[in-house]
Structures are given as structure tokens and as C-alpha cells.
Amino acid sequence: MLKSISSSSGDDHLLSLIVSSTGKLHLRQIHALLLRTSLIRNSDVFHHFLSRLALSLIPRDINYSCRVFSQRLNPTLSHCNTMIRAFSLSQTPCEGFRLFRSLRRNSSLPANPLSSSFALKCCIKSGDLLGGLQIHGKIFSDGFLSDSLLMTTLMDLYSTCENSTDACKVFDEIPKRDTVSWNVLFSCYLRNKRTRDVLVLFDKMKNDVDGCVKPDGVTCLLALQACANLGALDFGKQVHDFIDENGLSGALNLSNTLVSMYSRCGSMDKAYQVFYGMRERNVVSWTALISGLAMNGFGKEAIEAFNEMLKFGISPEEQTLTGLLSACSHSGLVAEGMMFFDRMRSGEFKIKPNLHHYGCVVDLLGRARLLDKAYSLIKSMEMKPDSTIWRTLLGACRVHGDVELGERVISHLIELKAEEAGDYVLLLNTYSTVGKWEKVTELRSLMKEKRIHTKPGCSAIELQGTVHEFIVDDVSHPRKEEIYKMLAEINQQLKIAGYVAEITSELHNLESEEEKGYALRYHSEKLAIAFGILVTPPGTTIRVTKNLRTCVDCHNFAKFVSDVYDRIVIVRDRSRFHHFKGGSCSCNDFW
């Protein structure tokens, strides 16, 4: 074939051969032919060959592409753009930005919007905000602000560099916003933890009176992720309805995300409904279900789902096994969890245990009060344990009041230079649980010396699509007087039922137990639960999400509320879901 091309006068045949080439060896043969016949000098042929080599070859060989590009004496703008784009897809994106700057200095080759777009993608890949700012200035001076595609890429840069303010400014300047522009803004808000703004945007986009843009599958995917993060079940149902009404329900990735969203909002019945209504399921679908069952405390059901998946001939992925081991941990299924972990180590699933898997097993052993065994497992790991694994063990030390081991764990975290405010809070909890107030005072002084500030607790509850957030002693809510009055009434009713504040949850060494009980009275989840009882009809399920691990006192408070007020209370804290019903919790008082 190559020999026949050398004698052919038709470039079309050659271009077709370049486009259809399938591997590096084939492209090297074509390269040799182009050099031998001098066809490499043909700008069109060179562009096609460079594009195929730099952009289409899997795996890409950026070094070979650079050598070919450097042999071109007078590369055109298209040739340069191809290389800048290739660098944006490589592991050396900064080289693409350097080429762009070199191009800018060449007055005979003025950059076009494509050059700026590919250079921005190089900055996105490398996280180079300063370089992006320089390109933004050039876009302005070159008069490219009306290029919607280029401006959308600029938004993506600011979003990636966690500069949502400038991303929003760019969005406002885009003359004609399409769905892609909106989706980049959605992604920006999610990445920058402006999750509630995503819901506002979705409503605005969905109700656009001009009808210029409507949410597509990607928009719905991002909105569902926001609902999952916030625990906004009602809004998630609205997005689900939109998906069904607009013919998007057949998309596998949307169905998988719906299963995950409902699970993370504590609605496993809806998650099951979506899962078993799917026309096809892949390993991501099963993983979403298993992980959802795990975080909601349905360990046996998660094991059943895993075995069912294997019967369908679907092999698990790393995340699937993380969900499975987590399910065993959250449900106290020690024997089952160790059995699956041993099967992993034997190579049955062709997946070697990673840090996440070890973390789940440490959690499993810690929950079962097998702290020494958990510590031994960590010390025997083939890879170096990370801070998350040590924090998992530290959490178990807090629950079981093992001060000595807790102090050892903190020393490991300090050695990793990974200690955080939450670690010290766990150790403070451990000290307070066993009444070592002098240790609490010492540790607080150390935290002050190290300028370690604790993260404030924040609890959220959704009402008719609106998310209401509370912090401890919150007085910002417009209905604060009603909320505090309701909370006082709840406390009175719970006291009659036998509720007593768990004063070990109060980390300050106050003078009396009464003072400690008062200090615990206005924790954020209590305010959220009181608001839920205030504004919803009797029998309505109350769903609360919290950014931190819920304390023992608030956990007891929720148990009593579920019994006295005959409500199902679902609290999602940093570690898991707590389903409170009839005075009991699905976590069996271990979290």
C-alpha cells in the first residue's frame, strides 16, 4: 500500500491513509514515506499527519510529535494550534502555554480564538491561574470577547482554579449563552461548594421564559449531584420528574446518578425503584446501590446485592468492594467483612486492597472494639497508611474511650504532618468521655498555640425545595423565635420521657452538669429538627444533613424525638446515615 502511494499523484489517497492509520508503527512508516517523497513539505499533508500523530494516537507520543513539529521550518497557525492542543492533553501542559506565548511574539502568525482556547486548556490542566489571566488579557485586547466557546473555556479555567466570582463575571459577559456555558457554571458552583446556587440555577434555567436554553442530561447530572450533597430529596424528585418529562430517563449515567442521589438522601425505597426500573445496568449501577445500602446501614441487603451482581457475571471494581466492606462495617458484620477482605487478598476479585479497603476494615474492627487488632492491621499494611486510616482508628478510640491508643494515633498523624482540627476534637471527646478535664485543657492550649481552629457544625433541612441551614446558637433564621420556642417545648417533652443531656458531649469543663446541659441545648441539628417539627405535618419524615460527626447528645436527642413525636428522623452526618425510628437508630449507637 505504502509503495503504491509513493508513485501516486493523488493527495486524497495519502490523506485517507493517514486518517485511517491505527498504530505508531504504521504512522512511522507513513512518516518515512513523507520524508522520502518530500511530501512532508506539503502544508496540508503535514497538518493531517501531525494531527493524527499528536491528537489521535493512543497512547499519544508527545515527544515524537514535538520532533516532527520542530522539523517544520515555517509552521502555520494551524500547525501551532495542533501542538498547543496536544500539550493540553498531555502530562506537560505548561509546554503548550510556552508555545502560545512564542506564537504571540511572532507578528506574522497572529493567534486566533482557537489558539487562546487551547492555551487556556493547558492552564486548566496545570492549574495555572496566572497564565490564564494573561490569556484573558489577550482575549480582551484581541477583541475575542464575543466568542462564546472561548469565553466558556475561560469560565472553566476560573472554576478549576476555585475562582467562582470571576467565572460568574465571565458568564455574565457571554453574549449568547448555550447549554454548555450553563453547565460549566453549574460545575463551577459544585466545585467551589456553592451547592445551593446550583439548585437556584437549575430552576432559573428550567423556567427560562425565552426558551433559548433548557437543561440537558449533563445539567440534570450536576443538579442531582448537588441534591445528593445537600440531602435535598424534594428538589431531587423535581429533577427526576424533569428527566422523565423530557425523555432523558433512558440515559444510563442519569439512572446511576439517581440511584446515588436517592441513597444519599436516605430514600432507599426510591433508589431501589429506580435501580430495578433500569433497562440495563452496569457495574456503576450496582456500585451505586451497594454503596447506598452501606451508608444507610443495610449491610445484609448490600451483601445480597453484591452476590446478585456476581450471578449476573459483572465483576466488581475497587469502589464496589469499598461499598461492600463499608456495608459490613456500618452493620457490625465483622465475620462477613473479614471474609470478603480475605477473598480480596487471595486474588479472587483480581483487585488488590487499597487504602480505602484497609480503612473500611479498620473501621469494621474498631466498631467491634477490636482496637488492638485494627492497630496491628495498620502496622502490617504493605503500603504506607494515610491520615484517613489513622483518623478512622481515632474515631474508634473516641467511642470506646481508649485514651492511650488515641494519643498514639495522634502522634502518627503529627508524623504525617496531617493533623487537622477534627483530629484534636476526637481526642478531646475521648478525654471528656473518661473525665480527663486536665487533658482537655492541655489539648485546647496546644490547639491555640498551633492556631488550629475547629470547623463550625452546620445542619441543613429542606422544605419545599428550599434548603434551610443552621449553626450552633443560630439566630439568623427569620423564624428564630418560633424555632427556639418549639425547641424548648421539645426539650420539656423529652425530659418527661426520660431524656437526660449527655454532658460528655460538652468539651468545656463547666462548673455544673446543668451548665453543660444548657451548652448542649442549641446544637445545629437540634435547631434543624425543631424547625422540621414546627413546619411539617405530624408523621412527616424529618431529614437533616450535617457537615460533621453528630455528637452523642444530639444522637440521643434524635432517638427520643423519633419516639415521643412518632416521627422518622433521618440524619446524615459526615460518617453515615442515622435512621431514627421508635427510639432506636439504625447505627445501633455506633458511628
Curated annotation (Swiss-Prot):
Taxonomic superkingdom: Eukaryota
Signal peptide region: none
InterPro entries per the UniProt record, alphabetical: DYW_dom (IPR032867), E_motif (IPR046848), Pentatricopeptide_rpt (IPR002885), PPR_At4g14850-like_plant (IPR046960), TPR-like_helical_dom_sf (IPR011990)
UniProt PPR repeat ranges: 76-110, 112-146, 147-177, 178-208, 216-250, 251-281, 282-316, 317-351, 354-384
Cited PROSITE patterns: PPR
Family, as annotated: Belongs to the PPR family. PCMP-H subfamily.
Keywords: Repeat
GO MF, one annotated term: zinc ion binding
Membrane-traversing stretches: none
Disulfides per UniProt: none
GO biological process: RNA modification
Name of the protein in its database record: Pentatricopeptide repeat-containing protein At3g47530
Coiled-coil region: none
KW Chaperone (keyword) present: no
Region feature (Type E(+) motif): 465-495
Pfam families, sorted: DYW_deaminase, E_motif, PPR, PPR_2
Keyword Repeat assigned: yes
Region Type E motif, residue ranges: 389-464
Region of interest (Type DYW motif), ranges: 496-591
